[in-house]
């Protein structure tokens, strides 16, 4: 925790010293996120994994402890220009004893400086430099980030252009496979008809040549998003096209990058929140993807998932959830047997939260029972279920943000 203490001290010191730099009383910010889960099945343990949450829904399918603690302060103001320091530490912990030295691992996720109001022509525009979550976009019920280039770099966002907003970022990345690359991201969002908006974004990924590898990894991801609000909720459709040897990196998840996996992928998502009737609501996520890679065995993959979470408000501070998820993937390779993966999940949960009529109300405590089934487990790297088995897990979860 020494790293956390040093970070807190640095931000506090910056805030305290700010009035000496400019005649300005700083505004301090404290925000964060946490979740924790525990449960057991017939064997006395949970099979829950991060990958499983992304595939069939996270309700009743998380057993880790994860947290993010953010601190920030507006440390100086000159006329209408405000200078802000932002920081965030991520903490992961397993179920080890708290007195074990390796129980919690702090990671620095954000540390950057933002300037708002520097441009006389657009006082809402913000310029940033440092390590930052760069306008991440996710689907909450599966914890799936479909647009995430977060890292160390610089950029500008909320820049007015016509009827919409423009942003541009440059981010550097290194991954565990010693692949070094740069991401160039531009996005433009603008309103359409009443309640609707459209965003177009493009990420170009450029690999770096090394003495050992002269081949340059380049890739591109184009993203189109249509958002529609209505009286009973909202809906979003996202279409993505990724191409090139580095197309996985363009999504901000470069951990499986390889220099011999040139190819293309096409993916469509639909997700949103709907009021069915009165106190009965539903959140859903559906997607479908096809990909082909020009590797030594001409790998082709097809992947799909459907997750629905209906929920009903019982009282002012209680509600009941159900969540149903199904996932499938098929991998085809020349001269090899097809690999198939199938997972199905059903969860029922009783939840306590300050405002049970608001899906996003937190903190929330949940008590759940989950049925989980996995078949066709030829894909040996898949965790979260035993091949051809059915498990029932019961447990509790908590989630909060502030």
Task: Label the predicted regions.
Residues 72, 114, 130, 157, ...:
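Residues in well-ordered beta-strands of folded domains
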Residues 36-42, 75, 89-95, 131-135, ...:
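Transmembrane beta-strands of outer-membrane beta-barrel pores
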Residues 2-122, 127, 159, 273-275, ...:
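Beta-barrel outer-membrane channel/assembly domains of diderm bacteria
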């Amino acid at each position: 925790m020494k790293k956390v203490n040093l970070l807190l001290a640095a931000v506090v010191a910056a805030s305290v010293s700010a009035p000496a730099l400019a005649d300005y009383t700083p505004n301090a910010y404290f925000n964060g996120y946490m979740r924790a889960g525990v449960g057991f099945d017939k064997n006395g343990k949970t099979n829950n994994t991060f990958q499983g949450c992304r595939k069939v829904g996270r309700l009743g399918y998380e057993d880790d402890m994860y947290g993010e603690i953010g601190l920030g302060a507006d440390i100086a103001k000159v006329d209408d220009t405000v200078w802000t320091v932002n920081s965030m530490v991520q903490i992961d912990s397993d179920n080890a004893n708290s007195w074990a030295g390796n129980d919690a691992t702090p990671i620095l996720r954000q540390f950057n400086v933002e300037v708002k109001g520097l441009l006389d022509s657009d006082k809402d525009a913000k310029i940033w430099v440092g390590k930052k979550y760069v306008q991440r976009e996710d689907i909450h019920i599966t914890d799936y980030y479909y647009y995430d280039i977060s890292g160390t770099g610089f950029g500008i966002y909320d820049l007015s252009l016509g009827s919409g907003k423009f942003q541009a970022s440059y981010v550097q990345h290194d991954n565990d496979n010693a692949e070094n690359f740069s991401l160039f991201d531009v996005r433009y969002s603008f309103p359409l008809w009443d309640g609707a908006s459209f965003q177009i974004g493009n990420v170009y990924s450029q690999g770096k040549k090394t003495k050992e590898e002269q081949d340059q990894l380049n890739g591109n991801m184009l993203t189109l998003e249509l958002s529609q609000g209505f009286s009973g909720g909202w809906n979003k459709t996202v279409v993505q096209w990724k191409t090139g040897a580095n197309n996985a990196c363009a999504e901000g998840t470069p951990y499986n990058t390889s220099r011999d996996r040139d190819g293309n992928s096409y993916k469509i998502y639909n997700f949103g929140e709907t009021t069915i009737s009165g106190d009965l609501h539903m959140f859903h996520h559906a997607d479908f993807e096809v990909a082909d890679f020009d590797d030594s065995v001409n790998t082709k993959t097809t992947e799909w998932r459907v997750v629905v979470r209906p929920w009903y408000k019982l009282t002012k501070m209680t509600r009941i959830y159900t969540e149903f998820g199904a996932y499938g993937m098929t991998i085809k390779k020349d001269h090899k047997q097809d690999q198939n993966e199938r997972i199905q999940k059903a969860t029922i949960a009783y939840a306590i939260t300050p405002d049970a009529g608001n899906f996003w109300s937190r903190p929330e405590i949940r008590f759940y029972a989950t049925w989980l089934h996995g078949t066709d487990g030829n894909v040996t790297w898949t965790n979260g279920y035993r091949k051809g088995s059915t498990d029932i897990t019961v447990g509790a979860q908590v989630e909060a943000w502030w």
